[in-house]
């Protein structure tokens, strides 16, 4: 995040930080979950807001205009692209998280999905 903020500052750009919240899963197992849909929604929204506020503080310390937003989606890559389009972003700045081995196969790469499907340029920071 700090590298993205430095990049935006150098260009005199504003900043939109998003986090993606996974919706409550309505699987057969959801009836065995220890929390209700409302409890889940409240908990994940609170966690998202905490993360976003930490990020906002870091960016605003660099005197950069910043907006933070949480999107709800089962597909983080799709939500990132939708957010970038909705906020008329000129660039999507993403970290390249090096998941390795079996986890990479199971989880896939959200960064790769954004790179593949976004019509907005994507900068990957490693």
Where are the predicted features?
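Small/aliphatic-rich secondary-structure junction motif
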Residues: 1-35, 58-67
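Short, well-ordered secondary-structure micro-motifs
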Residues: 27-30, 78-81, 104-106
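Short, hinge-like loop/turn segments at secondary-structure boundaries
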Residues: 33-36, 84-87, 110-111
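A short acidic, glycine-rich active-site loop
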Residues: 36-50
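Structural beta-alpha unit
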Residues: 57-92
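Glycine-rich, Arg-bearing micro-motifs that act as flexible, cationic patches
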Residues: 91-116
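Short, flexible loop segments at boundaries between secondary-structure elements
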Residues: 120-126
């Amino acid at each position: 995040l700090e590298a993205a903020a430095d990049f935006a500052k150098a260009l005199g750009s504003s900043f939109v930080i998003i986090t993606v919240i996974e919706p409550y899963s309505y699987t057969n197992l959801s009836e065995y979950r220890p929390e209700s849909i409302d409890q889940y929604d409240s908990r994940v929204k609170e966690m998202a807001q905490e993360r976003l506020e930490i990020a906002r503080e870091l960016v605003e310390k660099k005197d950069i205009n910043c907006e933070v937003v949480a999107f709800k989606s089962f597909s983080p890559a799709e939500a990132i692209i939708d957010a970038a389009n909705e906020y008329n972003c000129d660039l999507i700045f993403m970290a390249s998280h090096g998941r390795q081995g079996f986890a990479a196969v199971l989880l896939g790469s959200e960064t790769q999905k954004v790179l593949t499907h976004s019509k907005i340029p994507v900068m990957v920071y490693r």
